[in-house]
């Protein structure tokens, strides 16, 4: 979390590189370094953040643990044959990391990659996804409602010639239940708003009678 980590460097698609500690302007010294990931895992497509980082390659997942010293980061392969084909299929809520691989939906729990869409969900999604536009899949989490979501183009949209996503499959990681929604979008992402003060109420309306939400509700608390 104290480094900027990048991957898929021009000319070295399997390379990760990190900045100096607490200084993203430094790329030489201050514990900055790089590492070429060995094996046939493919190019780096996503890197998660936090106290523990996960580097997603197309067919491999590598865990990054900060140890300092000459080593800086300890790199451990936790998934030697499964990764994320597309980087945008990865999303996280703090240390909970979710992703879609070419054989289904998964969550990383420590050093374990656990299937969350085994059987029915994975079969449904594989049949419903318009694979000609699979690169349009976009994932995001809603931490307040404990949801991991994947926006995708379905085969049922017969008029879709541009790959616009028309469905969203949703996993509630508190209840471990799935749901499906119709939509028409190309992006989803988490966004948190600040709280409203009395001074900011004019942004909503100059007349309190025109405001639909009661002033004593959590609508105005922010963070949603």
Regions found by a protein language model. Give the residues of each.
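Hydrophobic alpha-helical transmembrane segments corresponding to the first two to three helices
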Residues: 35-37
